[in-house]
Amino acid sequence: MSALTARFFAETGIEVRATFQPVGVLREKLVAGEPCDLLVSTHVMLEELALEGRIVADTVAMLGRVRTGIAVRSRDRAPAIDTREALGASLVAAPAIYLPDPARATAGIHFLKVLRVLALDQELAPRLHTHANGAAAMAALARSDQEGSIGCTQITEIRITSGVKLVGPLKGSLELATAYAVGLSAVARDGAHARRFAEMLAGRESAALRLQSGFEP
C-alpha cells in the first residue's frame, strides 16, 4: 500500500489517507456516514454494499484471494502446522496466541472456529491476546518476550509486519481463503481520483506487488 500511495502522490499531488480496520468495523463506519472515497474489503461485503447503494456497483474490482496464516516472531523456530494434529500440538505448546478481533475481523472469527474444531477453544482461551485488527495483533506478537508465541491473521498482515515471519497458511479443511476487492463509495468526494487509485490497486501495474504482499489470483 505505501508504495502505491507514494506513486499516486507523485502522479496526482494528492495524499491517500488510509484507515485499517476489520471488515465489520469498516462497514459500520461507512453505514454511519464516515467520509470515504474508496473501500477495500471482502468481495462479498462490497457486493452487499453495492446492492444497498453504498458502493458504485460497476466500480467493484477484484484484488485477489488472501489466505489466513500462522506467524511466529522472526527469531523463533517455525512450529509444525501441516496437519490438524500438528497445528493443535503447536497451539497447545504456545505460551500466548495473538489474533485480530474474533467478533468482527475475518481472520479472528475463523481462528475461533478452528479452535472449536480442534476442541481447544476452552483450554486456550486464557492465552488468547485479541487486538483491533490483524496488523495490531502481529505488532504485539513481534513485541512479545515469550518464546514460542504464535499469531494467526491474514497473510497480507503478517508479511507487512516487521519482527514476525509467516510459518504458512492454515491447511486442508481448516484453510480460509478470502476474496478481497475495491469499490468506489457512492458518496465519494473525489470520485475521479478515487477511481484512478482503484485502478492502481487492482490493475496490472500493481499485480507483482499484490502477489508479493500475499494476494493470490
Describe the residue ranges of each PLM region.
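Exported/periplasmic ABC-transporter solute-binding proteins
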Residues: 1-19, 24, 28-35, 43-52, ...
